[in-house]
Amino acid sequence: DGANAEATDNKPGVFERDEKKCCWNRACTRLVPCSK
C-alpha cells in the first residue's frame, strides 16, 4: 500500500517515456496506470 502514492527518484518528464517508472511515479500515475 502506498506504492503508487510515493514518487521515486524518477525525474519529471522521464516517466512520459518509461511506463515502468511511470508506475511508481505519483504524477505519472494520473496519466498512465501501473500495469504488470
Swiss-Prot record:
One of its GO terms (cellular component) is extracellular region. The keyword DNA-binding does not apply. GO terms for molecular function: ion channel regulator activity; toxin activity. Its main location: secreted. It is found in: Secreted. Expressed by the venom duct. Residues 1-21 form a propeptide. Disulfide bonds join 22-28, 23-34. Keywords: Cleavage on pair of basic residues, Disulfide bond, Ion channel impairing toxin, Neurotoxin, Secreted, Toxin. Belongs to the conotoxin A superfamily. The cysteine framework is I (CC-C-C). Alpha4/5 pattern. This is Conotoxin Bu21. It comes from Conus bullatus. The lineage of its organism: Eukaryota, Metazoa, Spiralia, Lophotrochozoa, Mollusca.
